[in-house]
From Swiss-Prot:
<feature type="binding site">
    <location>
        <begin position="157"/>
        <end position="158"/>
    </location>
    <ligand>
        <name>a 1,2-diacyl-sn-glycero-3-phospho-(1D-myo-inositol 4-phosphate)</name>
    </ligand>
</feature>
<dbReference type="GO" id="GO:0016125">
    <property type="term" value="P:sterol metabolic process"/>
</dbReference>
<keyword id="KW-0963">Cytoplasm</keyword>
<protein>
    <recommendedName>
        <fullName>Oxysterol-binding protein homolog 6</fullName>
    </recommendedName>
</protein>
<dbReference type="GO" id="GO:0070273">
    <property type="term" value="F:phosphatidylinositol-4-phosphate binding"/>
</dbReference>
<keyword id="KW-0813">Transport</keyword>
<dbReference type="Pfam" id="PF01237">
    <property type="entry name" value="Oxysterol_BP"/>
</dbReference>
<dbReference type="GO" id="GO:0030011">
    <property type="term" value="P:maintenance of cell polarity"/>
</dbReference>
<dbReference type="GO" id="GO:0032541">
    <property type="term" value="C:cortical endoplasmic reticulum"/>
</dbReference>
<comment type="function">
    <text>Lipid transport protein (LTP) involved in non-vesicular transfer of lipids between membranes. Functions in phosphoinositide-coupled directional transport of various lipids by carrying the lipid molecule in a hydrophobic pocket and transferring it between membranes through the cytosol. Involved in maintenance of intracellular sterol distribution and homeostasis. Catalyzes the lipid countertransport between the endoplasmic reticulum (ER) and the plasma membrane (PM).</text>
</comment>
<dbReference type="GO" id="GO:0001786">
    <property type="term" value="F:phosphatidylserine binding"/>
</dbReference>
<feature type="binding site">
    <location>
        <position position="183"/>
    </location>
    <ligand>
        <name>a 1,2-diacyl-sn-glycero-3-phospho-L-serine</name>
    </ligand>
</feature>
<dbReference type="GO" id="GO:0055092">
    <property type="term" value="P:sterol homeostasis"/>
</dbReference>
<comment type="similarity">
    <text>Belongs to the OSBP family.</text>
</comment>
<dbReference type="GO" id="GO:0008289">
    <property type="term" value="F:lipid binding"/>
</dbReference>
<keyword id="KW-0472">Membrane</keyword>
<feature type="binding site">
    <location>
        <position position="359"/>
    </location>
    <ligand>
        <name>a 1,2-diacyl-sn-glycero-3-phospho-(1D-myo-inositol 4-phosphate)</name>
    </ligand>
</feature>
Length: 448
């Protein structure tokens, strides 16, 4: 539909056409391209000794979520913002939405979901753990003159869980998801077992039951190798599952063996629910991926996705001066500023201050018998796919302009938007007031 955007964004925030490999680190920089400290591997002898001291107190299989790690392995980004890495290739979603053939549409969705995994620091870094109630919003000015909107919030701390919402209203595309990383110590490795899933819907494409076509997608797990001996590096491992009403893909992220194998390889098959195989996918998730048409047995695999040739479209975020104290970039600013100049003592102290404040708040909630409630997401109802969903009801068949207004009422997303008193009310209270308003409108239709 491509209606006029509600605000004019800043210059295009595009990354260069380069693959963010998990096993490469470069300290070189030019006058126009300064060093990004997220790309610097600071695993020197003293750093390794710090990690060894922490690890020596652990047993294999124990939970790492309560362990304080040194700041030199932290990325200058909260997990709430890190999720947007998966949303930086909207062109594949738009192509999927316009594709009439269900199998081809499935392949575009698979390409979209595979495209973002290579966006990561070149050094071994982990995102900042969001604090309870932390939130992050962003938007994209798309090439088709439409806008995409993103809202996320840390809904639980033990276990850590963040919920997110993404929508392109004018193209009837909606994404909801939760991320539940469960960290484990495995000897010379640590693992983040990525529970949770992503739910993609094309709201104007109906399945056999007349409901929006839905895709449910899971994540591979993340492993950090070499934490006791050898060089530290990140691997993705285990299986990613993508399911639609008609097809499913099981893609294995293969970890390298001690002797044989290679790093970063993937291997998978696209099938229908009768077991008929249509395509095989292979290659490397941070390099080039190939697709082989199994209905053409003599054909060779063709390039499916070359990560070196794709330019991610980075999200845009409101200025810091407009952000709330629990908004990710503002909350962690002193920490990320210190990390940017590699001042780890200051980063450690600022991080401690934030986390200690959270401990005091948690203690007070226990003393007062008060339960934490998210502001932007609600607990799911029976039968829903995720633990949490955005609290505001956005009707599937509503006019896109009304959908946009509803989204912008949830939280400030665009530059110039102001916080309202309603923003700070827990989501479940907002839902109650919504129901009362709807009931009043039904009882007094003349006042609408």
């Amino acid at each position: 539909m491509g209606s006029k955007k509600l605000t004019v964004g800043s210059d295009s925030h595009r990354l260069s056409k380069s693959s963010f490999s998990s096993n490469k680190s470069s300290h070189s920089a030019t006058k126009d391209q300064p060093i990004d400290t997220d790309d610097i591997d600071e695993d020197d002898e003293s750093g390794h000794n710090i990690i060894l001291n922490i690890i020596s107190q652990l047993r294999p299989g124990c939970d790492l979520t309560r362990i304080t790690l040194p700041t030199f392995i932290l990325e200058k980004k909260s997990m709430l913002e890190r999720v947007t890495n998966q949303l930086q290739f909207p062109e594949f979603l738009l192509q999927a939405h316009s594709e009439k053939d269900p199998l081809k549409r499935f392949l575009y969705v698979m390409k979209w979901y595979l495209a973002g995994w290579h966006i990561a620091p070149k050094a071994v870094k982990k995102p900042l753990n969001p604090v309870l109630g932390e939130y992050f919003t962003a938007y994209w000015d798309l090439p088709n003159k439409q806008q995409a909107y993103y809202i996320s919030e840390q809904t639980s701390h033990h276990p850590p869980e963040c919920a997110y919402f993404y929508m392109i209203p004018e193209s009837s595309i909606r994404v909801d998801g939760v991320v539940i990383p469960k960290s484990r110590f495995l000897g010379n490795s640590s693992a983040a077992m990525m529970d949770g899933s992503t739910v993609l819907q094309f709201l104007d494409i109906k399945d056999g039951n007349g409901k929006p076509e839905k895709y449910v997608l899971t994540q591979p797990n993340v492993y950090v190798r070499g934490i006791l001996f050898g060089k530290m590096r990140i691997e993705l491992g285990d299986h990613m599952i993508i399911k639609s009403p008609n097809f499913q893909a099981d893609i294995e992220f293969k970890t390298k063996g001690y002797v044989f194998g290679t790093y970063d390889a993937i291997e998978g098959t696209v099938k229908d629910y009768d077991g008929n195989a249509y395509y095989e996918i292979s290659g490397k998730w941070n390099d080039v991926m190939y697709l082989k048409d199994l209905k053409q047995p003599r054909s060779s695999p063709k390039v499916f996705l070359d990560t070196h040739k794709e330019s991610p479209l980075r999200p845009k975020v409101r200025p810091l001066s407009e952000q709330g104290e629990y908004e990710s970039r503002k909350l962690w600013k002193k920490v990320t500023d210190a990390l940017a100049v590699r001042n780890h003592p200051v980063a450690t102290e600022e991080k401690f201050q934030i986390e200690d404040h959270q401990r005091q708040l948690a203690k007070k909630r226990i003393e007062d018998g008060v339960e934490f409630h998210p502001k932007l997401f609600r607990r799911s109802k029976p039968g829903e796919d995720l633990d949490y969903c955005i609290y505001k009801n956005i009707p599937v068949d509503e006019d896109p302009e009304k959908q946009i207004r509803s989204i912008l009422q949830i939280a400030p997303i665009l530059p110039g938007q102001q916080f309202t008193d309603k923003f700070f009310i827990p989501a479940f209270e907002k839902i109650k007031s919504q129901k009362k308003m709807i009931e009043n409108e039904k009882q007094n239709p003349a006042k609408q």
